[in-house]
Amino acid sequence: MTGRTRVRTAVPFALSLALAGALLPGATLAQDEAPAPPHDQPGPAAERLLYNSFFVDRAPLDIEAENMDLYLFGLKTEAAQDLRGTEGIELNDAPATQVSLILNPAPAEREDELNPFSIKEIRQAMQNLVNREAIAQDIYQGAGEPQLTHVGPSDPDFLTIYDIDRGSGISYDPELARALIAEAMTAAGAELVDDKWQYEGRPVRLKLVGRVEDERRDIADLVRAELEAAGFTVAITYDQFAAALQKVYATDPAAFEWHIYTEGYVRSAPRRYDVGAVNAYIAPWLGEMPGWREEGYWQYENEELDALGKTLYRGEFESLEERNEIYRAMTQASLDESIRIWLATVDNSFPAVDTLEGMTNDLVGGPRNPWALREAYVPGSDDVRVGNQWIWTERTTYNPIGGFGDAYAADVWRNLTDPTIWNDAFTGIPVPFRANYEVETAGPEGTLEVPSDAVAWDVETKTWKPVPAGTTAVSKVTFDYSLFTDANWHHGQPITLADAVYNIAQGVDLAYDPEKARIETAVAVTSRPVLETFKGYRLTEDDRLEVYVDYWHFDDDHIGAYAEPAGFDMPWEVKAAMDDLVFEQRRAAYTATAASRFSVPWLSLVLERDAGLVDRTLRSLERDEFVPPGVFEFGDRSLVTPE
């Protein structure tokens, strides 16, 4: 079958912004109106980003006092309304937050206990027990919009599932919800005694975890009242970020540290054709559903959703129409399962001083995108001062393997490392950020021959081995990393292809090396379904990296984004030291669950203790002239020597 080829190159963002303005209906922005940077040197507009923590209730006072230039956490609705129109302050508005309830569906292990949320009909009844209109209009004072599925009204895929959303029949109907709950509880053997459910003579008690920092405290109170009216005994705890996440996401659901939690998700990029959110919020294979794919934990399982999710994620469809049908099927199944009860999309207001120039807001995340603070500056200052609700908490972990799972750390990390590809701030289509790429595909029905000198990482021999004769792939993406490799790391050493190659080998090892997979189970089991589609790699004479994948999409840029194998987040030497610390010395872990299971620290490079461990390991590896065996013998190329 004849394939197609497309070349994508990075465009200066000021130019792309101007072009976007020229193309949008009613837009007046012209190319010469794009903000002029304060200098003509390479790199970001400002010299430094200075981060500091400002509690959300005090943030309006602090930004009025010019203690910061930008607050990267959405203000409470009333505070935003009071601040709007204040001289010297601008509000950057975006539908950047989605709120939901996650239910614990694990069955009770003891015969004299009952978890109501292990019963599907009770989870479904929760859809009618929550008052989304009250949350959107009263709690968020009109700044929220009711949301029934993982797709909010501002998302492009809302049109894909519009009829499912509007035809679901879900509305606030507490009498119906209580009747459905009563029917299911009675069938399970529970009794209603003095308007309270009992099972085996004991009250049916639910543990509700509510976040205390924002409007989710009010949501928790609202949900508690509805649950109590339905006959449940509710024990509510109000936790801040770290304590809540530890209780919910780092424990076995069967331990019942929680039954229901008020989730909140921030968004950092629009998605024209979503694959990540629909899988993360619905399908258990990706590790974001109760059980979190951690070894030894009870797991929520759903083979149908996993099969649909992997099909969508791996591009195993032949048209836009087929893709949309899979997406719709997953959305409908998520409503049937009702593990997450979606509540609202919230318009956040991010205040900034009006002297902050050059900043870009995308359509869903506002200033939470990689262009915003790279382009932002305050005239006459080398610094941009960024405030957030938190900069560090007990659950904030700086490591690129199993950390950066919270918005606060991710907000910093986004400006410490350049992505190769990122979704366009306006269209939601992947575009080059710091790597150019060329896509060639024979999909959806054909295949390409993988060259005989292409290689794949072999976990058993710890070497790059030639791919077997006759290996084929659906698509080929050729990456030009010269915008990275023509520059240095912050410590002055050159960025090289060895940094990317180490990342590729490391990822495969984490997934398939039996001992490493035993230690970091969640990382291993969630990455294998994707790694299975990567067929081989080849370095060209001009240092481009060819990646061969069994993946197709009707939009070539999505093929490019899928095939991006590793990127350049930190020098390979640091990654090697971390691997040694985690897998050889066993003195740290990449993920929270592994750290808990093996009673070692969850590795975070901003903590003096952990940074010291990595530093000492680096020095030891340097003394021994250590080079990871086999990793840098790539085809007929030696990318690193001990010297």
Give the predicted meaning of each segment.
Residues 31-47, 85, 116, 195-200, ...:
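Surface-exposed, Gly/Pro/Thr- and Asp/Glu-enriched linker/hinge segments
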Residues 37-38, 50-109, 133, 138-139, ...:
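Extracellular/periplasmic solute-recognition and catalytic clefts
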Residues 60-67, 113-125, 448-516, 547:
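Aromatic- and charge-enriched surface segment that lines or borders ligand/interaction sites
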Residues 89-98, 102-108, 245-312, 401-402:
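Acidic-aromatic pocket-rim loops
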Residues 124, 136-139, 235-245, 274-353, ...:
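Extracytoplasmic/peripheral linker and loop segments enriched in polar/acidic and small residues
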Residues 146-191, 210-218, 318:
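Structural transition elements
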Residues 285, 349-394, 405-408, 641:
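Long beta-strand-rich cores associated with HINT superfamily self-processing modules
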Residues 388-472:
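N-terminal lobe/hinge region of extracytoplasmic solute-binding protein
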